[in-house]
């Protein structure tokens, strides 16, 4: 592992040459040259499919594919690569858990606790399952600190509570709840815990064994990897108890017109030809990330968010929704619609997001219809902060009467 060097880190992202001032890494991270090269090499030099053909090139590709599974397991400190299921991303992983593990075990009146801070991907699947089974979704509200109020969790848990769905890190505020305490309380009541790691994975790799996490999902594209690839971690006994969600090739051990026998997990949960290129690219991203001190990189990103927040706070009407000095800065200006402001910022070459960030209940709890969100990554610079502040000043001159 090398000490973090902002200039060296930034130099590895060719897209920055044409991305403007890129402050939208919470939506998707840019890709380093190492990931681009791995993906290019796969398409130029690889032959065959995984877990199917017997010729040498296909066998080598299968070995790389399974080595990537082991790399993800090591990154999460999972006991085994067999505890990792490939998915298209966090959304598919959560839906898989909801439909394959939770739905068959729910009865009418059972309860699914979901934090108010969740991305829609960790809320809508539970609303769907509740509608299918007669269970109900119970809200774990925000506290005064804009984090899920873990202190109120004990009072919400009842004998009918079955699942806790909670995010590792908010994609709006950047706030990180006390996962360890939430998991302890849920497990004491016999509940299963689904952790959405989509936003948090790149900032704080989760130790799934130390936290005693039941299910954990993340997406490659927010982790400097390709789009369309993600992973689900599940405790081995929980994955073994899941019935296949999709049927098709590769996931069966035996099939006839009388029925079929699925492969054991994780393979029985991975129907069809997988996204091999995505797996190779994700593995390359994790290998590349391991070369830098992630903690130092995170501190750099946080310092940029603090610098931006301090500068913008000097402008009249500024309001920040940032939590815990995170690298995400969600903000608004009184009397100015976020869509108007982000349009003018885009014209100035500032790439960030405005709107509800796929978190409508959270925005409602914050009392706003939408925010702007500048999400800082280790490849950003103090010059990027200065450009953002300058562009905001120019926009305010136009928008403020």
Predicted regions mapped to residue ranges:
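Pyridoxal 5′-phosphate
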Residues: 1-401
């Amino acid at each position: 592992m090398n000490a973090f060097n902002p200039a060296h880190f930034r130099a590895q992202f060719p897209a920055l040459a044409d991305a403007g001032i890129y402050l939208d890494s919470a939506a998707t991270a840019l890709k380093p040259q190492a990931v681009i090269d791995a993906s290019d090499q796969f398409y130029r030099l690889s032959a065959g499919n995984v877990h199917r053909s017997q010729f040498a090139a296909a066998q080598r590709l299968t070995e790389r594919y399974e080595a990537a599974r082991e790399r993800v397991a090591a990154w999460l400190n999972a006991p085994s690569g067999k505890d990792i299921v490939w998915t298209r991303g966090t959304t598919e992983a959560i839906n898989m858990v909801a439909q394959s593990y939770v739905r068959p075990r729910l009865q009418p009146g059972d309860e699914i606790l979901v934090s108010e801070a969740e991305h829609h991907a960790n809320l809508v699947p539970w609303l769907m399952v509740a509608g299918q089974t007669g269970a109900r979704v119970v809200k774990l509200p925000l506290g005064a600190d804009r984090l899920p109020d873990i202190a109120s969790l004990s009072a919400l848990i009842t004998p009918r509570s079955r699942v806790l769905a909670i995010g590792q890190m908010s994609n709006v505020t950047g706030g990180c709840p006390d996962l360890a305490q939430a998991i302890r309380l849920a497990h004491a009541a016999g509940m299963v815990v689904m952790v959405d790691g989509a936003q948090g994975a790149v900032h704080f790799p989760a130790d799934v064994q130390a936290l005693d996490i039941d299910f954990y999902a993340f997406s490659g594209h927010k982790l400097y990897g390709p789009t369309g690839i993600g992973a689900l971690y599940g405790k081995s006994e929980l994955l073994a108890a899941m019935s296949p969600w999709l049927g098709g090739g590769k996931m069966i051990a035996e099939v006839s017109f009388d029925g079929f026998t699925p492969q054991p997990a994780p393979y029985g949960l991975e129907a069809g030809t997988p996204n091999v290129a995505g797996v190779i690219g994700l593995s390359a991203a994790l290998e590349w990330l391991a070369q830098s001190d992630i903690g130092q990189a995170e501190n750099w990103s946080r310092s940029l968010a603090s610098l931006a927040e301090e500068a913008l706070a000097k402008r009249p009407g500024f309001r920040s929704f940032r939590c815990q000095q995170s690298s995400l800065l969600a903000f608004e200006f009184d009397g100015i619609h976020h869509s108007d402001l982000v349009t003018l910022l885009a014209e100035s070459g500032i790439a960030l997001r405005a709107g509800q960030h796929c978190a409508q209940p959270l925005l409602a709890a914050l009392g706003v219809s939408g925010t702007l969100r500048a999400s800082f990554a280790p490849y950003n610079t103090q010059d990027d902060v200065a450009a953002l502040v300058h562009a905001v000043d120019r926009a305010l001159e136009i928008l403020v009467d």
